[in-house]
Regions:
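Compositionally biased, intrinsically disordered or flexible polar/acidic segments
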Residues: 2-233
Length: 233
């Protein structure tokens, strides 16, 4: 019996079997969430994406981001207010939208105004990268709203690592506001804002918006990777 246990334990320790076990555990977690979670796969046309490089000068817009191949534009025409900050030390990050940011020293609430399609399901992604752009060594903490409703609290806890917030949302009108709300002494910032229209069958939900709960990358046993996204109402 002990020999069998030792053999089973040794098999689990192999990299391939550990990957299989990880995938099985992940599958069980997803099943356990039942109707409150789904795997999200965006099969939209990239031409329908909204990709804003926040703080990008209009003269440098648009551009094709080398790592993703997506076309980014300046956020200049989508928000009133805010100032442009440039990250001097990006911590080795190669993602181009992290090189600049927009920060909001004035006002309590600063909102992006975006044109969307009413009733369409969107994956909304907001990226925040501090990089000590102001030299003050003060990590920002503030709230993020969808219109008048609370989305999440953005608590940036690392200087040189991006903070990413994601949510699935169905706008009820053709206009969508994404607002940064100052809640303390630190200054709200944002590096990038991305919207992806999703297929209606990507996630079936009747309880409003769905905030990202977890993300996991698992091997597909062929050489690539599969991204699993778990969203919670």
């Amino acid at each position: 019996m002990n020999d069998r246990r030792n053999l089973f334990s040794s098999c689990l320790k192999t990299p391939q079997n550990m990957e299989i076990l990880q995938g099985l555990v992940l599958a069980l977690i997803i099943v356990a969430f039942g109707t409150t979670t789904r795997l999200v796969q965006a099969a939209s046309d990239p031409r329908e994406f909204i990709n804003l490089d926040c703080g990008l000068h209009p003269a440098a817009s648009p551009y094709t981001e080398p790592l993703t191949g997506l076309v980014f534009t300046s956020d200049e025409n989508f928000i009133q207010g805010g100032q442009i900050g440039r990250v001097i030390n990006d911590g080795g990050e190669a993602y181009k939208p992290l090189k600049v940011l927009r920060y909001f020293p004035d006002g309590i609430r600063n909102c992006y105004h975006l044109k969307v399609t009413s009733g369409t399901k969107y994956l909304i992604k907001a990226v925040f990268f501090y990089g000590n752009y102001d030299g003050l060594d003060v990590l920002p903490k503030f709230d993020l709203h969808l219109g008048p409703n609370m989305w999440t609290t953005v608590d940036i806890d690392m200087y040189f690592s991006p903070k990413i917030e994601e949510i699935i949302h169905i706008p009820k009108s053709s206009s969508l506001q994404i607002c940064l709300v100052k809640t303390g002494k630190s200054t709200p910032i944002i590096s990038a804002l991305e919207l992806r229209p999703l297929r209606d069958d990507t996630y079936v939900n009747t309880n409003g918006s769905l905030k990202l709960l977890a993300r996991n990358y698992a091997s597909d046993f062929i050489g690539g990777s599969i991204r699993y996204f778990i969203y919670l109402a």
